[in-house]
Amino acid sequence: MEIINAVGRRKTSIARIYLSNGKGDISINKTSLEKYFPSEAIITLVKQPLQQIEAIDQYDIKINVKGGGFKGQAEAVRLGIARALCEVNPSFRPSLKKEGFLTRDSRMVERKKYGHKKARKSFQFSKR
């Protein structure tokens, strides 16, 4: 199998996924998954698509990710891995789609408006 490319995005994070046959090595920005992400919960979030199709140690994955924080990056990586797996084998698509791994979460930070302290918070109003 050749190398398969996919892209995942979430908030301001962009993850580029390079998936190939292997024995389950996942590296992010040339470091291991466990070193890059501090929390065990985030690591399981990244591995969810692989666990769903029971292919946790069939593919080597190289990931370049930039922008955002840990959670946004992890969700971008999860989307990218799910998209790459669908390219490898289209029969994975229904189970991944059912779990919501192929849905791009389009929520972004709302912009700050002039005349306000934040996006929605106003300055204190005094009637008199």
Curated annotation (Swiss-Prot):
Disulfide bonds: none annotated. It comes from the Bacteria. GO terms for molecular function: RNA binding; structural constituent of ribosome. InterPro entries: Ribosomal_Su5_D2-typ_SF, Ribosomal_uS9, Ribosomal_uS9_bac/plastid, Ribosomal_uS9_CS, Ribsml_uS5_D2-typ_fold_subgr. Keywords: Ribonucleoprotein, Ribosomal protein. Pfam families: Ribosomal_S9. GO terms for cellular component: cytosolic small ribosomal subunit. One of its GO terms (biological process) is translation. NCBIfam families: PRK00132.1. Belongs to the universal ribosomal protein uS9 family. This is Small ribosomal subunit protein uS9. It comes from Amoebophilus asiaticus (strain 5a2). The gene is rpsI.
